[in-house]
Curated annotation (Swiss-Prot):
This is Nascent polypeptide-associated complex protein. Contacts the emerging nascent chain on the ribosome. CDD domains: NAC_NACA, UBA_AeNAC. HAMAP family: NAC_arch. SUPFAM superfamilies: UBA-like. One of its GO terms (biological process) is protein transport. Pfam families: NAC, UBA_HYPK. PROSITE patterns: NAC_AB.
């Protein structure tokens, strides 16, 4: 082969003959992969979808960074804990964080304090 690559058009034709369809997903800004502990954010992502025998495979290329998940506590939950226990917003928020968002546990902890 002497270091020469294959003609892209010929490569595409061969893949089509083998039942492989490849297409690029346009205008992708970022891709987020959510795991139990963190999110992997891939910015400036180029996404290619390869379909082989009905199964799709996604190839993602870009600038990846891992972002730890933070516990998001809804304002309604904070308000409910405040109303039930008579504590400040900050105390209610801290109790919910300490209980991993469990309303009952936060209320019991504040009530018994």
């Amino acid at each position: 082969m002497g270091g020469r690559g294959m003609n892209p058009a010929k490569m595409k034709q061969m893949m089509k003959q083998m039942g492989i369809d490849v297409k690029e997903l346009k205008d992708v800004k970022e891709v987020i992969i959510k795991t139990a502990d963190s999110n992997i954010v891939i910015e400036n992502a180029n996404v290619t979808i390869m379909t082989v025998q009905g199964s799709e495979t996604y190839q993602i290329v870009g600038d990846a960074k891992e972002v730890p998940k933070s516990l998001e506590i809804p304002a309604d939950d904070i308000k409910l804990v405040m109303e039930q226990t008579g504590v400040s917003e900050e105390e209610a928020r801290n109790a919910l964080k300490n209980s991993n968002g469990d309303l009952a546990e936060a209320i019991v902890a504040l009530s018994s304090a």
